């Protein structure tokens, strides 16, 4: 006699058949196999380690042909996917805010300059950040290093924005050894210097005279050592290197005695020390059993600062500009989970793309975010699929001022507030830039447009462009002219008009820039530590 079906109670001939618990188990296995995290080939969501360098130039790594020795980074890049058409923002705060929100700075109110020490400003508190989304997906989230996304209120701090732990500094730059940052205080008619180093939300006062890259590497490797491999990890390691001030232990400069320019020589040592630090982090991932299920990402936040040893040759411009030298990012992905390795990707990508890419890879959801400007790039990176991104807004800043003018210049060129009839879609006196496929349009004053050859390797320190200083519109075919030497706006007026129309669209859909006056209440005189003051 047949047995009773547990589902219906009816007689079923031919033996026992599958029971309900077994069916549920098979269904769970099927759902697991179809999840985004399984798409990488991992048995669980992958660990994500994101290393962000500060002010690292295009010509500052070995795999871009630099004389600076970076064997660990070179090896990781050679075994991974080099992002050769990858863009960041010209300055610290804009890149970091777009990395963690997946949204353009025109949608955050952060399109003008960066967050100053005493400004009552931070990434809007109603924005959901990458670590919050990864926590919801079951990740442990840790941050080490530079924040620079605002700290005037405790609600702005990393530990209030999704990170389980934080060790680092909150402002834009500081001394590598004393960990003190200096900023203007209006009531002093001068500057105040105070400690800017925290463990969680408490001041970390016991690290004086210890080089910051070494401190941050030690904390990162400790996080890795203490992390259970079965739980997914997100580690955001934002090095101080290689932002000024130019400081490094003497032994790291010794291999670069052939570099005559002192700034470049110190800078080279700083890059080499950072390269060694990256090697120590990847060594820790391997020795503690995490590497085989890790996606390791390396990126700069903006182009190199040529006034402080950095170099972007042969690209035009530098940090703070919309020229390629300011925004074309050095970056790569290394991971055993990549389906293609040892390749160079020419697919268009932007720093806003990391949030949707990593959240999807983690099996998480972006449903709680505001509309994203980033795209999921994992199949592009891992498998070589075409990029879903064809357009990229570099920025629109109608209040732009040139804080880093060309050598011998001391002001931003005067604006012409008229709307030339042939370019009526957008006011071309406004500082703006947009990319569509291979085309890049710039308007207004993009920043210093010189080319800067590597120091000590050329008879000239800079090469100025030829053309009127009042020029406010350029079009380049970046695929054919990555050095931005040939303006082709006159040859392609229809492309100019289309891109100006797109700039006007973005301009109309942007939020007002939030750049409040400095608040004298920020003064850390009473505590000696830069801290929230509101």
Swiss-Prot record:
Q: Which CDD domains match?
A: 4-S
- Glycosylation is annotated at 189, 280, 292, 367, 427, 459
- What Enzyme Commission number(s) does the record list for this chain? 3.1.6.12
- Cofactor needs: Ca(2+)
Q: Disulfide bonds, which pairs?
A: 118-522, 122-156, 182-193, 406-448
Q: Where is the active site?
A: 92 (nucleophile), 148
Quaternary data: Homodimer.
Q: What is this protein called?
A: Arylsulfatase B
Q: Which organism is it from?
A: Mus musculus
Which gene holds the coding sequence for this protein? Arsb
